Amino acid sequence: MADVYLVKAVRPRYDKSESLVNKIPELMEKAGIKDVVKDGDVVAIKVHFGVRGGYRIIRPQFIRAVVDVVKGLGGKPFVTDTWGLNHVYDAYYNGLSYATLGAPVIPANGIKENDFRVVKLDEYYWLSEVEVAGNIYDADVLINFAHAKGHGGAGYGGVIKNIALGCVTQRTRRAQHSKEREVGVKAFHEAMADVVKAVLSNKQGKVFHMLWIMDVVEHCDCTAFGMIPLVPDIGVAASKDLVSIEKAGLDLINQAPSVPGSVADKYGLKPGENKFLRIHGRDPYVQVEVAEKAGLGSSQYKLIEL
């Protein structure tokens, strides 16, 4: 069983010290960031840059708070995502830059997605080789800062998807999606687990996961639009266990009431329902199950609210 820490979006009083952004340092400290980031470490902060037209990505001030924590520990952070140089322009358009974040914003696998390291797996579901983004592979530490939201192919995109589809080359992304078309959704989830295993293969004890459970919409951040969040903002979670934080995030979303006027109205979603299964017809908990089976973490967790 792993600990998952949560700072809730609803704060107990109107005070600067209770700001969700200002609680990020405490959240990261409680979740064990000091065990992960050491003085001199080069730290990749993996987020989704979004695209032009979309506006539900993690807000810059939250990423800046993570950058500042890393700097305070002597780390050398950079903020990153794949898709090459064009995606960096998307990041700038969406307000993610050195000026706003206090760290370089660079493509994870080069300006044309040609910078990668081939990682071979001895045990895998479908993919024996994975092309890991070079800057992710070379970094000493990976902070996996994901946005909890829906995903048309996987049903849900959280910390697993942020690595599986966001830390590799276009060829590896296509290899995962092809399993959905050729075999089925579970095979897609299994291929994602293969990729996560490969990406984290040289990061033992040097990975930290964060989940922004805010603006929880039914679509991915790669879409050029934004819809009304389907549940109220829940908060920000952190853990050193990938599977535990993913399971906790899904549970919190499913326990939450729906937001009137959102896609939840169309499906009549109620607290306790598997919301993304209803919306996309794909069970996101399969991601959790296959990742746990692959040895990537535990689905048993203890939720600790700060």
Language model features by range: what are they?
Residues A2-G54, I58-I63, V67-L306:
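Extended, low-polarity segments enriched in aliphatic/aromatic residues
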